[in-house]
Each structure stands twice: as structure tokens, then as C-alpha cells.
């Protein structure tokens, strides 16, 4: 027996004049207008249960296909799923991607114009322990987790624009599937290491009055004149408080929601969509901020990468870049060798702080 067709415009005489026409269910409508499923889709759009395969375990959304109407910042008043799509595709993706490109371009232009910040004086060969083994382990664990999350996140969010056209949909699908799992496993590692980093470096990141002068002079980035600072300057403290603590808490909290790792939380689609939007905005801002941090810690400043790799800096480096910290060390207020390992070796590090 073949499939019978029906013309949905073949309405029985005066069918629409029935006062209850608009309230008919699908069965009643089928009698006067066969094939017209408008009543069913009205119920679907109204959020009536029974129109999806979501099981009872997904309550209170079990059987619910279409979400209610909402209006998120940047979206029209529409169903929640469509509102989320509008915010993501019309705001987060284009403006977030533009911000990352602008920051990357600005860093490249700055490096092209200024190059690596070199030491003005000659190195003395006398080493000061800037980072203990514990501090370096915490930093590198967090840094590796961050890179894994950043790379996987960028590919997942923006990859369809610059990777998909090159490798094709099949390979891109496998790539994003793999990176999604990397992202989900690196997230908790980032969260734990972020907590350790915060408490490890908290003591030397409290604001001081000297930070005001540093900020007003822009850290001497354009004048070429170093502004005296303690162990961490005002720029590093901004990264610590705004990036590590502020954005870090938002990124981790929203990520834990997306990974469904918060006990007792009902993971409705609306909850996940809001968490996704917050996560997207916060991570883009964090990546933009940390791009500057990564630049200064690698090719932007002579000796910065070596300091985090080996733990040591030359006295000249300490005096030129963190003069107040250096003065405290010379005055005996702060030990030049902070870890038991450094003390045991008398601070005689065999590594170079000039890399």
C-alpha cells in the first residue's frame, strides 16, 4: 500500500469558520484539513511535553522539544535555543575572533618596532632565585593546561572558518571530537593548578603604592626607562587579579557547568546555553590578556623565559626590571636563594639567565 498524499489547502467547506478551529488538536484538524499538522507544531512551540525523546531522567525538560521564549543580551525575543545561537554566531564568534586577531597583530607590530627588551648593563654572573621549584611546577602545569584549552577551544569555536575548508568535514569532525575530549580533561587540571598558582603567588601580588607610578608611566614600555617595582610589577599584578582570579573563576565555574561536574545542579538546556555564552566571553578575554603575558615571558624580554625555566635571574636583570625587589634582597629583607635546593647549592646555579 502506497503512501497517500493530502493537499493541506483542501479545506472542507467553511472549516475555518468554526469558532474552535484555532483550538483544534491534530486529530480534529485532520478531519477537516487532512495533512495539516499546525496544531501539533503549535504545541511543540508552546513547550508541551511529549514531542522529543528526552527521557524522564532529563526532567524537567523530559519530552520537551522547543524551549520557551527569552531575550539574551544581543539577541531578539525568540526561543532560547535560537537566542543562544544568535548571541554566539552574531557576537561571541565574530567579535571574540576579531579581538584575538587584533591583540596578536598589536603584539607582532610592537615586537617589530621594539624587538626584545635587552639588558642595559652587563650580566654579573651572580644568580638570584626568582622562582622556586614549586612555583615553577605550578606555573608550567597551569600553562600547559591553558595552552591545551586555548588551542582546542579556538579550533572548536573558529576552526570551521580556517581549518574546515582545508581538511574537509570528515577529518575536521574527527579533529574537533578529539579536541573536545582534550578540552574536557584539561579543564579540571587547569582548575586545580589555577588554585595552586593563586595561593602560591598571592603574597607578592598585593597592590602597593609604587604600582600607581608604574601604571601612570606605562611600565616604561614606550619610554625605555624602567619603572622601579617589587617582585611583580603592576602589569603582572593586573594579570594575576583580573586574569588568574577574576576571569579564572568565571572560566572554571562555567566550564564545570558545561562538564556537568557540579553536584546537585539541574543541567537544563537553558543553563548550559548561559554557561556556554559566559564561558565563551570569559575565555576570549582571558586569552587576549594572556597573549600579552606569554609575549613578555618569552620573546618580549631577555631573561624572562629563562627565569621561569631555570628559576634564576642575573643580578643585573633583577636590578633593571624589579629594582625595589633587588634592593630588598641586598638589604637582607628577602633571601636571594629562597628554596632549600638553592640554599644547599649556595645559589650557584649553572644555568644562564640571559636566554
Language-model segment annotations:
Residues 1-355:
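Membrane-embedded alpha-helical bundles that constitute the cytochrome b-like, heme-associated redox core
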Amino acid at each position: 500500500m502506497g503512501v497517500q498524499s493530502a493537499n493541506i489547502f483542501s479545506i472542507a467547506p467553511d472549516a475555518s469558520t468554526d469558532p474552535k478551529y484555532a483550538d483544534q488538536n491534530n486529530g480534529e484538524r485532520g478531519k477537516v484539513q487532512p495533512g495539516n499538522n499546525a496544531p501539533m507544531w503549535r504545541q511543540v512551540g508552546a513547550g508541551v511535553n511529549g514531542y522529543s525523546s528526552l527521557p524522564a531522567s532529563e526532567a524537567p525538560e523530559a519530552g520537551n522539544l522547543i524551549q520557551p521564549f527569552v531575550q539574551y543580551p544581543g539577541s531578539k525575543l525568540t526561543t532560547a535555543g535560537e537566542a543562544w545561537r544568535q548571541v554566539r554566531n552574531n557576537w561571541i564568534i565574530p567579535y571574540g575572533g576579531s579581538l584575538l586577531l587584533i591583540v596578536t597583530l598589536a603584539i607582532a607590530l610592537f615586537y617589530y618596532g621594539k624587538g626584545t627588551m635587552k639588558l642595559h648593563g652587563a650580566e654579573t654572573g651572580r644568580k638570584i632565585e626568582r622562582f622556586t621549584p614549586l612555583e615553577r611546577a605550578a606555573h608550567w602545569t597551569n600553562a600547559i593546561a591553558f595552552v591545551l584549552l586555548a588551542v582546542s577551544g579556538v579550533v572548536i569555536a573558529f576552526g570551521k572558518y580556517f581549518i574546515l575548508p582545508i581538511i574537509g568535514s570528515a577529518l575536521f569532525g574527527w579533529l574537533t571530537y578529539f579536541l573536545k575530549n582534550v578540552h574536557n580533561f584539561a579543564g579540571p587540571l587547569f582548575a586545580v593548578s589555577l588554585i595552586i598558582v593563586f595561593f602560591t603567588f598571592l603574597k607578592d601580588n598585593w597592590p602597593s603604592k609604587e604600582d600607581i607610578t608604574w601604571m601612570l608611566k606605562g611600565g616604561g614600555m614606550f619610554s625605555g626607562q624602567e619603572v622601579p617595582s617589587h617582585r611583580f610589577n603592576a602589569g603582572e599584578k593586573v594579570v594575576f587579579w583580573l586574569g588568574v582570579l577574576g576571569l579564572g573563576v568565571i572560566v572554571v565555574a562555567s566550564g564545570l557547568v558545561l562538564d556537568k561536574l557540579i553536584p546537585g545542579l539541574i543541567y537544563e538546556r537553558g543553563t548550559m546555553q548561559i554557561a556556554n555564552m559566559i564561558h565563551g566571553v570569559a575565555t576570549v578575554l582571558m586569552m587576549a590578556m594572556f597573549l600579552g603575558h606569554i609575549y613578555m615571558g618569552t620573546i618580549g624580554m631577555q631573561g624572562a623565559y629563562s627565569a621561569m625555566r631555570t628559576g634564576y635571574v642575573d643580578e643585573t636583570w633583577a636590578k633593571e626590571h624589579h629594582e625595589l625587589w633587588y634592593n630588598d634582597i641586598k638589604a637582607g629583607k628577602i633571601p636571594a636563594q629562597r628554596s632549600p635546593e638553592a640554599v644547599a647549592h649556595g645559589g650557584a646555579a649553572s644555568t644562564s639567565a640571559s636566554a
